Amino acid sequence: MATPASAPDTRALVADFVGYKLRQKGYVCGAGPGEGPAADPLHQAMRAAGDEFETRFRRTFSDLAAQLHVTPGSAQQRFTQVSDELFQGGPNWGRLVAFFVFGAALCAESVNKEMEPLVGQVQEWMVAYLETRLADWIHSSGGWAEFTALYGDGALEEARRLREGNWASVRTVLTGAVALGALVTVGAFFASK
């Protein structure tokens, strides 16, 4: 389980990544997390891995957040459903990157649909999910230092060859998550009739 000392690291990583992705999409102005080049090697590694993920899976992943039809009342449930589906086959670094990209996409969709207060909430859900459901796996897999070694500072090319299987399984999981989101939406629609 996460130690209290890891909470600021996790929180800072989530805030930096979400801020970075929102700025890439032109949603955030001014100084804040994700502004400019990342000084922390972990933040640099997560940004690079997230960019690579989006490049590889743009077609599969591009509209996932929009397809979930998130509202303030359904956002946390949808976030948890997709996150649980993503890690159903067990965690790996590729799925962890997908989790960060999904969280940032959900934040961008919230801003796009004028639900900005959800951005902070989604970040809190990401931190809580990481610290309650993934902390043991992260620790047993070498911690964030191992992630940084795999994805950071020039290691991305080498890591790409090592993790090809991780990315392929992420595509399957994301397709299932989209289908799950669609089924939940259709089920809720018919239940309201």
Swiss-Prot record:
It is found in: Mitochondrion membrane. It is a peripheral membrane protein. Pfam families: Bcl-2, BH4. InterPro entries: Apop_reg_BclW (IPR013280), Bcl-2-like_sf (IPR036834), Bcl-2_BH1-3 (IPR046371), Bcl-2_fam (IPR026298), Bcl2-like (IPR002475), Bcl2_BH1_motif_CS (IPR020717), Bcl2_BH2_motif_CS (IPR020726), Bcl2_BH4 (IPR003093). GO terms for biological process: extrinsic apoptotic signaling pathway in absence of ligand; intrinsic apoptotic signaling pathway in response to DNA damage; positive regulation of apoptotic process; release of cytochrome c from mitochondria. A motif (BH4) lies at residues 9-29. Keywords: Acetylation, Apoptosis, Membrane, Mitochondrion. GO terms for cellular component: mitochondrial outer membrane. Its main location: mitochondrion. The keyword Acetylation applies. Belongs to the Bcl-2 family. Interacts with HIF3A (via C-terminus domain). Interacts with BOP. The BH4 motif seems to be involved in the anti-apoptotic function. PANTHER family: BCL-2 RELATED, BCL-2-LIKE PROTEIN 2. This is Bcl-2-like protein 2. It comes from Bos taurus (Bovine). The lineage of its organism: Eukaryota, Metazoa, Chordata, Craniata, Vertebrata. The gene is BCL2L2.
